[in-house]
Regions:
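Extended, low-hydrophobicity, polar/charged segments
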Residues: 1-175
Length: 175
């Protein structure tokens, strides 16, 4: 499988993914996942896509949302196309049955996922988190996501995301 853009894509290599991602992929029966090293200074989506020749619509962002109700905090990961924005205060807040929902603080997201900020991916997240995927992501043939590290990316068939634990496909998760 050839990856998008002008990157040197190779089969997933342990040194190019965060430890929780490598562990999750060790149990995943997919052979068509690719990784590519990138300049960590270009990990943010717009800069990454422009520099490496990737269409924004072929890139998906994973954000960690914290929903709170009283003293209870629930987390979810949301995967949406880079051309859209997550509906945090509508769809996600209702799904988490929370009074308030917001992007998780950076330190919390990093500590809870074991991944680098700016590289968080839906692969290898805590088992009790829902992974909310906007249906538009699945309409892509191939999608580029984080690797858990800022210095690399993963490319995979979008439909492979359906194999993730805790995945829920949601229409209108993003707009």
């Amino acid at each position: 499988m050839k990856g998008p853009g002008n990157l040197d894509w190779t089969p997933v290599a342990a040194g190019l993914v965060a430890a929780p991602v490598a562990e999750a992929l060790g149990n995943w029966p997919r052979a068509d996942l690719l990784t590519a090293p990138i300049d960590p200074e270009l990990a943010d989506t717009a800069a990454f896509c422009e520099h490496y020749g990737i269409e924004l619509a072929d890139s998906a962002n994973c954000v960690v949302i914290a929903g709170r109700r009283g003293q209870d905090t629930r987390y979810a990961a949301c995967l949406v196309l880079a051309t859209t924005r997550t509906d945090v205060n509508g769809v996600v807040r209702r799904r988490l049955d929370a009074r308030k929902a917001s992007f998780a603080p950076m330190d919390d997201a990093v500590a809870l996922t074991g991944m680098e900020y700016g590289g968080i991916t839906p692969i290898g997240l805590p088992a009790d988190w829902p992974v909310l995927v906007d249906r538009a992501v699945l309409d892509r043939d191939l999608v580029v996501i984080g690797s858990g590290l800022r210095r690399s990316k993963i490319a995979l068939p979008a439909k492979a995301l359906l194999e993730l634990p805790g995945v829920e496909v949601i229409d209108g998760l993003a707009s």
